[in-house]
Regions:
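C-terminal motif of bacterial Sec signal peptides marking the signal peptidase cleavage site
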Residues: 4-7
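Mature extracytoplasmic or organellar-lumen-exposed domains after removal of signal/transit peptides
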Residues: 9-291
């Protein structure tokens, strides 16, 4: 599985100081009226992010299909790799998928989140099947992966209907960073494989995807704050890369000082991104519909 770690928010360079404007960063933006260049950049941001999510959801469907095929062949090692790849792809659109809680829980629910009378399924059920016993429980994994294979195209279809506005894209990035700190860094997700570095790396990359999509618009609206967001995100990705290969570094190998530094960097990046997202309110809020 390849987890891309790319330069965050470097899609455009800040314009000259002569183009600077006064922008409110408290609650909502007062940047009005918008310019034709900004409106064009807003349309591009929505289209770019929609394509990014579409690519991730398509890859998720493919990874789940590979998982089913490798389980049918009895190849546990390959199936484990497929499960981690699918988990990383889900992390790319986790926050957007959260708009449909039933679909999201069907795909990525933890055992402790299963309600009375409900059955445990999805990615973490397959993870349990593959890692909780030596050599994996292929029969159980096949059953759980079959349900996941049926649900994956549903998730892809639901996501295809979303085209978040620039402000909403920024908020999704903030949510990614908050989830990274509150859920991934705490090592609460991968309870059987103990490879939470997969979630850490993929979620940081998801935040980067959001920041990169709105970067050209950000640099037109508030170049100074846009540069701060880019710098913070680049520093976060460097911290994540320093942890090592996500699929090879177990939770026991992740040092507390490293995780604390990463959490602080993610918190700082989230704060800056939240401020910048508020400046994008004039370009629309919310999500459904064509860009």
């Amino acid at each position: 599985m390849a987890l891309a770690v790319c330069a965050c928010g470097t899609a455009a360079s800040p314009p000259g100081h002569g183009d600077a404007r006064t922008v409110s960063r408290v609650g909502s933006a007062t940047h009005d009226p918008t310019t034709p260049a900004e409106r064009a950049a807003a349309v591009t941001a929505r289209s770019t992010f929609r394509d990014d999510i579409g690519n991730a959801s398509s890859a998720f469907v493919a990874d789940v299909a590979h998982l089913q095929g490798d389980l049918q062949a009895g190849d546990v090692a390959a199936a484990r790799s497929d499960e981690l790849a699918a988990q990383a792809q889900f992390d790319q659109f986790r926050q957007l998928a959260g708009g449909d809680p039933i679909n999201a829980s069907t795909v990525d629910e933890l055992a402790t989140q299963v309600g009375p009378g409900q059955s445990f399924g999805g990615l973490h059920a397959v993870e349990r099947d593959l890692w909780s016993v030596p050599g994996g429980d292929v029969g159980a994994a096949l059953s759980d992966a079959s349900g996941l294979e049926a649900q994956a195209p549903v998730a892809e279809f639901l996501l295809s209907k979303d085209a978040p506005a620039p402000e909403a894209i920024g908020v999704l990035g903030v949510d990614d960073l908050n989830w990274l700190v509150d859920q991934a860094v705490t090592e609460d997700q991968e309870r059987y494989s103990h490879l939470d570095a997969v979630d850490i790396a993929a979620t940081a990359d998801a935040a980067d995807t959001a920041v990169s999509a709105i970067a050209p618009l950000d640099h037109l609206v508030d170049p100074t704050l846009a540069a701060e967001v880019a710098e913070g995100c680049t520093a976060l990705l460097a911290d994540v890369a320093a942890l090592g290969p996500p699929t090879q570094v177990t939770d026991g190998q992740l040092g507390a000082p490293q995780l604390l530094a990463l959490s602080r960097q993610a918190d700082a990046a989230a704060a800056d991104l939240a401020r910048l997202s508020a400046d994008l309110v004039p370009f629309g809020t919310g999500g459904d519909g064509d860009p």
